[in-house]
Every structure is written in structure tokens, then in C-alpha cells.
Amino acid sequence: MFHPRARTMLLLSLPALIIGVASSLVLIASMKVASVFQQFLWQRLPASIGIAYDSPFWIVGMLTLTGIVVGLIIRYSPGHAGPDPAIEPLISMPVSPSALPGLLLALIIGLAGGVSLGPEHPIMTINIALAAAFGSRLFPRITALDWTILASAGTIGALFGTPVAAALIFSQTLSGSNDIPMWDRLFAPLMAAAAGSLTTSLFFHPHFSLPIAHYTQMRLVDIASGAIVAAIAIAAGMVAVWCLPRLHELLHRLKNPVLILGIGGFILGILGVIGGPLTLFKGLDEMQQMAFSQTLGAGDYFTLAVVKLAALVIAAASGFRGGRIFPAVFIGAALGLMLHAHVEAVPAAITVSCAILGLVLVVTRDGWLSLFMAAVVVPDTNLLPLLCIVMLPAWLLLAGKPLLAANRHEP
């Protein structure tokens, strides 16, 4: 009835569905626990002892304590809470399952404690390791690389609430051939991503879009404006690229994770006092609050962008377990709103979307993911042609430039 190619794809369908659903459930459970813990640490606990949650004492104390606790987990847990996200790429080969409890605990405490990183890197690591460990027993004919691809696709679908991001990302890595077309290779990852996104949507829907005025029609001057905005965002991101490996090396000369993360948490607390509560946490909810605020001006947006960028570098350099994509989106949104406030003739839809495109491109060096994030934050079909054009000079600027990553150090 079915062609052998179709039967091969169908055989991978069941593992892909299972992995997609499981990847989403791991994400949902982790985010729910972190959210409950965050409410306790930042609302109930300070209220019960009569301290404002946004007081300098509470912000500095909470982030310093968060750093110390995460440092203790990394030092004493089996596997040292997994790989350092500042060194490893977002998608990598499976780690030992023994490292996963410590990694999950470090992630939850970091998210709840206000660290300026997202969940994407640790969740990706956890899901890939679980898929490889359990999948190889249930379906031994499927290789570790295939489990890695399915788990990462399912996680991407769950994180962003849509399989589109996974389709875009894997379309450039799973290239077809004369024997196996690209869509044959994409079939199982796309099914895993669809299962992950649908499972996530049953519980909550990631809300990325901002209330920004509709962009009506593309003009030549808008292309130039968008390219300039993207270049400014890339320049800001390259400052972080220069700082991260140097700061990472400096901090890790201390050798002791408790001391490193305690110092990192203290610095994050100082930055949190300067930037306020909006610069804490992973950045998605805070981005919505920033966009809906009627009181922030150009100077406030600039402060938020600079502080959040500094917090991202400090958190990554210290070794906190978290990802850099969600904070980069916040930074891009703040930078875009600041540029629009300075030059109101340039539509906010252009400044925000192009700034996000530039920042995410620096962080991920993935053109499809950068376009996707810019398009979902400012969901306007009239912007898509402009963003595709602006991507070209942005990609040229970053060609051959170093990545936002630290170097490995000898123990």
C-alpha cells in the first residue's frame, strides 16, 4: 500500500510522537515548579516578613543566595549539573543521565531566583539525554543521533509553541540527497515538533507578540532603517561576544563553583537594583510588561537593554544553567523601543523586529531562528519581506565573527 520511503517515515512516527509529547511535559513541569517557587520567593516570603520584593536588600540577597545554592548543586551533585551552557552549543550529544537531577534543580532554582537566563539550554540537554537513554532501550535500531534530532525538535516545538521554528532550523541541517529528499528527513523531526507544540498548547501558549502598531507598506527607506537598526543591535551583541569568554576565564580562575556563582549572583543583584525587577528572570513576561508600560521613555529602555545585556553576560560567564535566546529577545525589544522613542519616524514594528533579529542572530548565529523570533514578536506579514532583506547585510556583518560562547579551560 505504501512506498518503502513512506513505511520508513511511518516507523519513525511513533517514537517522534512520544518524544515530542515527553519533551513538552518535561518543559511544562519544570516551568510550573519554577513559577510556584518564584511566587514564593518574590511575593509570599518578602510579604510575610514585611520587605518589599523590589527593595535593593531583597534583590541583592536573593540573587546572591541563588548563586550560592546553584554553586553547591554544581559542585556536589553527580555529573556537576551537566555541561556549562556558556561552552556547549544548544543542541549537542546526550549527557549522562546521572547529571540530570542536578541540572534540573539548578535550572529551577536559577529561574525562580531571578537569574537572567531562559530555560532552553538545560531543557534541551535534559530531553536529549532522556530520549537517548530510554529510547535506545525501547527502539534499539534508532541511533543516538536520531534521538538527539527528535528530542531537540520536540523541545523547540514545545518552547516556541509551534513546529515552524523546528522546521526552519532543521531544514538547513537535514539536507536531502538524490536518494532521500529533504522532506523525508524532516518528517519525523517535524512530527516531534508538532507533538511538542500541541502538548504545550493544552496547558499554556507561549506569548511572544507585543502590542505594536501595524506596519502598513514596505518602503525603500524602511529597508535602510531596518538595516541600520539590525547593525546597532549586532554591535551591542558583539560587545557581549567580546566580554563573555574573558569574564568566564576570569571567574573560573577561582575554581570553586560556590564562590564563582555566589559572586555572579551578587553582581546580578546589583544589576537588578540598577535596572529594576524588569531586568530579572528569563525576560518573556517582563518584555510584555515593558511593552505595555505607559511610563517608560527612551532613557528607561536604554537602561533596561544595557542592564539586561550585562546580566546575560554575567549569568552565562558565572556558569548558571540557562539559555541565552529569551533574554536576547528582551534586549532586542528594549533596544527597538528605545530607537523608536528616539526616532519616531521609524515605525516601532521595524525597530523592534530588526533589533530582535540582530540580537538573536548574534546569540544563535542561526538565520532562520532569528527571522522566526523577529516575526513572532512582531507578527505582521507585511514585515516578512523587509526582514528577509535586512537579514542579508546582518549576515554579512557577522560572517567569520566569533560566537557568543566561552572557551574551555583546563581543570
Curated annotation (Swiss-Prot):
One of its GO terms (cellular component) is plasma membrane. The gene is yfeO. The lineage of its organism: Bacteria, Pseudomonadati, Pseudomonadota, Gammaproteobacteria, Enterobacterales. Pfam families: Voltage_CLC (PF00654). The chain crosses the membrane at residues 9-31, 57-74, 95-117, 148-170, 186-208, 223-245, 258-280, 295-317, 322-341, 345-363, 376-398. It is a multi-pass membrane protein. Gene3D superfamilies: Clc chloride channel. PANTHER family: CHLORIDE CHANNEL PROTEIN CLC-E, ION-TRANSPORT PROTEIN YFEO-RELATED. This is Putative ion-transport protein YfeO. SUPFAM superfamilies: Clc chloride channel. HAMAP family: CLC_YfeO. Keywords: Cell membrane, Ion channel, Ion transport, Membrane, Transmembrane, Transmembrane helix, Transport. InterPro entries: Chloride_channel_YfeO, Cl-channel_core, ClC, ClC-type_chloride_channel. GO terms for molecular function: chloride transmembrane transporter activity; monoatomic ion channel activity. It comes from Salmonella typhi. Belongs to the chloride channel (TC 2.A.49) family. It is found in: Cell membrane.
